[in-house]
Amino acid sequence: MSNVTVAMSGGVDSSLAAYSLLKQGYSVSGITMIFRILFPDGESFLIGEQSAEDARKICAQLGIQHQIVDYTESFNEFVIGDFTNNYLEGRTPNPCIICNKNVKFGVLADHAFQNGSDYFATGHYSSIVNINEKYFIKRNPLDPKDQTYFLYKIRKEILPKIIFPLSGMQKSDVRLEAERANLITASKKDSQDICFLPDGDYRNFISKYISNTDICVSSGNFVDNEGKILGKHNGIFNYTIGQRRGLGVAYSHPLYVSGFNIEKNEVILSKKDELFSESLSASYVNLFADLDSGEYQLKTRYAQKDKSCIVKMTDNKLLIDFIEPIDAVTKGQSAVLYRGDLLIGGGIIDEVFY
């Protein structure tokens, strides 16, 4: 009998994942991570306490062991540091991607394997497929909130040991199955996108994080593409590419954030049509297969529809040419590649070419 550790969030997805594995005859245990956000001034707050309690209860209902692990050090090192530094440097990061790579499918999965688990499972709706002895993550075309964009940085070496018990399902299916199984989490609401932003406001978080430090965030100028001053901004980290609301600049036509000049502490504003770019480069690349000369499907942000592109690899960077221009491509976000529904890999966008 194979041992499987399920990453338990206390939600319906991971609950049904554990239940399904039990029904398939696996020896199942649950694990939940908690962590503290550590602010430079010494203040901290705990994340995951309620999730851990909910996970403990569902594991008790299922009759399986449950373990809580504290990954404060790892989460602050890999996720919070990257998150704040990117925003302060005019980039827009995606912390869930970094967390999946380094924490959930990093130290958490490794902990499971080191303690005797043969497999590590989560409540994703994607699937793991083996094609010619190469393992891929395959997106679920029925899932309107497909999560594979956030999974492209997982180490390919551990894919053979990952199980997604809910592959091919939809949320409505999951809730129905959970109700049939009388799982106590069947009607629990879905979790928020970014776990350490309870109010969803990253600006407040960064302002608090850098308070009482020697990091100085000063106001500067909004400028157009020619450098003409259009108004004052209140700190570069408050803005992202494509942003229109909250600029406080009156002009003859709508203006959007199109770039940053970090050295001059300037936020560049442009017309909508000037947000469209032709290509990008991406670093910190992770690929599940070698690239070829054919077309790939591309996402430059999570909710985006697929865009066609041509890709080549040069000096450990992805150089991606768009078949048609794409708007609001943003440094710090990820360029994620697909071939059909197969996740091929991706990288962090570091340059955008117009």
Over which residues does each language-model region extend?
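ATP-dependent adenylation/nucleotidyltransferase module used to activate substrates
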Residues: 1-152, 173
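AMP-forming adenylation/ATP pyrophosphatase catalytic core
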Residues: 121-354
